[in-house]
């Protein structure tokens, strides 16, 4: 039965990407964001995505194989390979802009899944290694599904920082990005904007 469900999902996902019909969200995500700083700028992003109760129930049913209420490292690896790795083609629903430059999001590290109060949270790191200079110090970070199958309530209410935080004075705010409007022009994504200056 499980294999049949995964096969059906595999058949349906391409239709979601190419269908011209108006979509509406089927999955909802409450995000948290941490920005890891390095000696030269931004090393990468830590996403923590908590899914709605219905999608969480599916994750638990399908991937908590020993029914202990946890997603082990082995179970998380299986989940990633079968139900998340395909988002690599879409930058893991993450856009990063530095001035006019679109920073490619191509790799994911340290994927894990936590179950708490019957809700599943994906945590993962996106390595970026973005150097910052006084002339080019502003970075925009967005997370959204352009096809609107999944609604990510981004930006989060707060942003965390880790890594070489003592080396930088950080300012952050939010801003709409009209150039990235999607869903037939109805939705304008909101970015987290950070500005880094050596402390």
Where are the regions that the model predicts?
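N-terminal signal peptide c-region/cleavage motif recognized by signal peptidases
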Residues: 18-20
């Amino acid at each position: 039965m499980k294999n049949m469900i995964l096969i059906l999902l595999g058949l349906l996902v391409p239709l979601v990407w190419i269908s011209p019909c108006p979509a509406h969200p089927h999955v909802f995500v409450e995000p948290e964001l941490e920005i890891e700083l390095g000696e030269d700028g931004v090393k990468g992003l830590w996403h923590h995505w908590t899914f709605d109760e219905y999608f969480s129930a599916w994750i638990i049913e399908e991937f908590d194989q020993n029914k202990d209420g946890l997603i082990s490292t082995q179970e998380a690896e299986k989940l990633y390979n079968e139900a998340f790795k395909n988002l690599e083609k879409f930058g893991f629903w993450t856009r990063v802009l530095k001035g006019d430059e679109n920073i490619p999001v191509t790799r994911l590290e340290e994927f894990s899944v936590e179950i708490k109060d019957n809700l599943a949270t994906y945590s993962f790191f996106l390595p970026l290694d973005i150097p910052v200079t006084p002339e080019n110090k502003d970075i925009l970070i967005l997370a959204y599904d352009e096809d609107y199958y999944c609604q990510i309530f981004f930006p989060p209410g707060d942003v965390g920082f880790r890594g070489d935080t003592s080396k930088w004075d950080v300012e952050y705010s939010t801003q709409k990005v009209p150039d990235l409007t999607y869903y037939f022009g109805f939705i304008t994504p909101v970015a987290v904007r950070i500005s880094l200056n050596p402390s």
